From Swiss-Prot:
Residues 297-401, 456-511 are annotated as: Disordered. InterPro entries: LPXTG_anchor, M_anchor, M_repeat, SMCR, SMDRR, YSIRK_signal_dom. This is M protein, serotype 24. The keyword Coiled coil applies.
Length: 539
């Protein structure tokens, strides 16, 4: 009866030992899962907080820069508007100055043409006045003298004609002398023509013509002397031959022509003598007009100088306004370029700000998502914590059961010694005991199969519970990370006493199973390999 109880108790111990090993392995896995979950959630929370702070700081910086650029843009717009208004005012002043300058130029051109007309009229009046003033009493006396000389020449001409009428028998020896006289006659005719021209121009005598008159008087004296010589020669030429009669006729024809020209000259002299008191009044009127024209000319010249000064001043103002307009246009162009650059920068900053806001929204969404995942992870962690506490409680119970089993094992060893002493059993008792042991072994195998099924169900349930937080994106918990070596310390510590339990059963001689069964070792090895592989992937 004692043997049966002992075998039954040992079989129960063996079953409890396998269950405890599986529970310890599951405890190790749960502890690693909890630690890894805490680490992942803490790292994710810190990274999310840092990213949100950086995004918020960058968004604030972009907002400040955007406000600064808006202020600069408003200042540039105000300055640009002021410059445009100033430019419009200068343009209007420039157009007014141009219009005024155009009117002044037109007035100057009109006055210049009027001055030219007055100067031409003045020149004509001066010429007429000079010609009219040169006929003085001395000139009248000189004209009378010329008339007297003309009368003397006419008398002398009559004497010569009489001499020519009597000179019908010129000799051949005097032909050369006649030719000489003809040449001198031609020279006299030429000189007479010059005198006629001088008489024709007697209306415009000036101071310079007085010298010419003196020259003519000297030539006239020379001609008178030459005339005397010719008269003497004619007195000696009384024996012209008959062959020279044709020549004489020609000379007579020329004489008639000279007489006709002399009559014309006399008429011209008579016209030159008709300067009366009416002409003197006309001369005074012309002098008064000349003085008025000179005064008007001086006034016009003064106005022209004033207009020229005004025109030059307007020209300088116009040049200054043009230069100022160019400078303003350059500044306006520069401001427009700066405005374009600032606008481009503002748009770029606006795009960056929009991008940062969009990134901030995405990060906030991710943060919200991570918070939800964190909540789920926290719930899973709490659930795992509860499971871990339960597994630790089970571990304590297992350790307590292990202590009880060790004490029972000591009792069994004691019984084993007693059984060794009672080896002298009969074959019948051995057969009965063998049958009982086989029956108990069969029952034990069936019970182990049931426990294996329950253990498989328990593993499937734990796997489904551990996969529930992993279904969410971003929650990557590694089971058993960093905890496998710690969990494995207790089995190493219990190794020594377990070696002592590897003894044979007293009745059948079978070797007793250790505390860590093959299933428990397989679970622990799988967990360790998974933890190492996951750690390599993270590194």
């Amino acid at each position: 009866m004692t043997k049966n109880n002992t075998n039954r108790h040992y079989s129960l111990r063996k079953l409890k030992t396998g269950t405890a090993s599986v529970a310890v392995a599951l405890t190790v896995l749960g502890a690693g899962l909890v630690v890894n979950t805490n680490e992942v959630s803490a790292v994710a929370t810190r990274s999310q907080t840092d990213t949100l702070e950086k995004v918020q700081e960058r968004a604030d910086k972009f907002e400040i820069e955007n406000n600064t650029l808006k202020l600069k843009n408003s200042d540039l717009s105000f300055n640009n508007k002021a410059l445009k208004d100033h430019n419009d005012e200068l343009t209007e002043e420039l157009s007014n100055a141009k219009e005024k300058l155009r009117k002044n130029d037109k007035s100057l051109s009109e006055k210049a043409s009027k001055i030219q007309e007055l100067e031409a009229r003045k020149a004509d009046l001066e010429k007429a006045l000079e010609g009219a003033m040169n006929f003085s009493t001395a000139d009248s006396a000189k004209i009378k003298t010329l008339e007297a000389e003309k009368a003397a020449l006419a008398a002398r001409k009559a004497d010569l004609e009489k001499a020519l009428e009597g000179a019908m028998n010129f000799s051949t020896a005097d032909s050369a002398k006649i030719k000489t006289l003809e040449a001198e006659k031609a020279a006299l005719e030429a000189r007479q023509a010059e005198l006629e021209k001088a008489l024709e121009g007697a209306m415009n005598f000036s101071t310079a013509d007085s010298a010419k008159i003196k020259t003519l008087e000297a030539e006239k004296a020379a001609l008178a002397a030459r005339k005397a010589d010719l008269e003497k020669a004619l007195e000696g030429a009384m024996n012209f031959s008959t062959a020279d009669s044709a020549k004489i006729k020609t000379l007579e024809a020329e004489k008639a022509a000279l007489e006709a020209r002399q009559a014309e000259l006399e008429k011209a002299l008579e016209g030159a003598m008709n300067f009366s008191t009416a002409d003197s009044a006309k001369i005074k009127t012309l002098e008064a007009e000349k003085a008025a024209l000179e005064a008007e000319k001086a006034d016009l010249e003064h106005q022209s100088q004033v207009l020229n000064a005004n025109r030059q001043s307007l020209r300088r103002d116009l040049d200054a306004s043009r230069e100022a307009k160019k400078q303003l246009e350059a500044e306006h162009q520069k401001l427009e370029e700066q405005n374009k650059i600032s606008e481009a920068s503002r748009q770029s900053l606006r795009r960056d700000l929009d991008a940062s806001r969009e990134a901030k929204k995405q990060l906030e969404a991710e943060h919200q998502k991570l918070e939800e995942q964190n909540k789920i992870s926290e719930a899973s962690r709490q659930s795992l914590r509860r499971d871990l506490d339960a597994s630790r409680e089970a571990k304590k119970q297992v350790e307590k059961a292990l202590e009880e089993a060790n004490s029972k094992l000591a009792a069994l060893e004691k019984l084993n010694k007693e059984l060794e002493e009672s080896k002298k059993l009969t074959e019948k008792e051995k057969a009965e005991l063998q049958a009982k042991l086989e029956a108990e072994a069969k029952a034990l195998k069936e019970k182990l199969a049931k426990q294996a099924e329950e253990l498989a169900k328990l593993r499937a349930g734990k796997a489904s519970d551990s996969q529930t937080p992993d279904a969410k994106p971003g929650n990557k918990a590694v089971p058993g990370k960093g905890q496998a070596p710690q969990a494995g310390t207790k089995p190493n510590q219990n190794k020594a006493p377990m070696k002592e339990t590897k003894r044979q059963l007293p009745s059948t001689g079978e070797t007793a199973n250790p505390f860590f069964t093959a299933a428990a070792l397989t679970v622990m090895a799988t967990a360790g390999v998974a933890a190492v592989v996951k750690r390599k992937e993270e590194n």
